[in-house]
Amino acid sequence: GPNGAGKTTLISIVCGIVKPSSGKISVENFDIIKDYRETRSRIGLVPQELTLEQFETVFNNVSYSRGLYGKKPDPLYIEKVLKQLSLWDKKDLGLRQLSGGMKRRVLIAKALSHEPSILFLDEPTAGVDVELRKEMWKVVEDLRETGVTIILTTHYIEEAEAIADRVGVINQGELIIVEQKKELLKKMGNKTLTVELQEEIAKIPDELSKYNLTLGDNNTSLNYKYDLREKRTGITNLLQDIKDSGLKLRDLKTEQSNLEKIFVSLVKENNEV
């Protein structure tokens, strides 16, 4: 969702940080208000800000978080989490000695310290460079393999496209769609057929005007957009009409709409309602 859409507010409500003004939310059949301890123990939260005890060691930071949830000390589990996040060799270092990327890993370790089944990552790559962002994507992918359900908020479309199984779009405090990523691309994505020509043309022939074509780079290609949901895309007729118009084809290629185009379309439609 865009900035100010309500992503962090929604997460804060689910995690029990902000009290909802109305409605009901349950986590694994436990009400977040009536069963606060039960729901909170099932959730790990990695906030946007680096909230860490700078003068403590990595190991003590993570162990302390486990105790906050009433869990007994378990050095072996903490060791497992730190190794999983490539932090074990830094367990005795103070937080002030770590890079920004490693500090974010410590935040994830703290969120996993009490063995939650759901992990919220609130814009974990906001404000970081491209290299660190891709490093965090790898961490998320590795965590997913362990069976933890991960809910990640982001306004980087490429991030959702790279690592998400399901995508939800929130705008003006409303969750306007939740869909499997592949299904979302299939249902809402348009495709573009690019017809590459053997020779440059000055303009699109009048007999092709009904197809709403656009000229491509260097006036040597024609672009045709069509809806995947339609039974008839019109491609067969288009190619025949191109041939009849005297244009000579060199190549054909298609391009699928990406999540960014779908996201912009959804938000625009929602704002107009």
Task: Tell where the protein language model's regions lie, with residue ranges.
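Conserved ABC ATPase "signature" region
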Residues: 63, 67-90
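Catalytic Walker B motif of ABC-type/P-loop ATPase nucleotide-binding domains
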Residues: 119-122
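Conserved ABC ATPase signature
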Residues: 94-98
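ABC transporter nucleotide-binding domain
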Residues: 137-227
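Conserved catalytic motifs of ABC-family nucleotide-binding domains
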Residues: 115
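Conserved ABC transporter NBD signature motif
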Residues: 23-34, 39
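Short, charged/small-residue-rich alpha-helical element at the C-terminal edge
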Residues: 192-266, 273
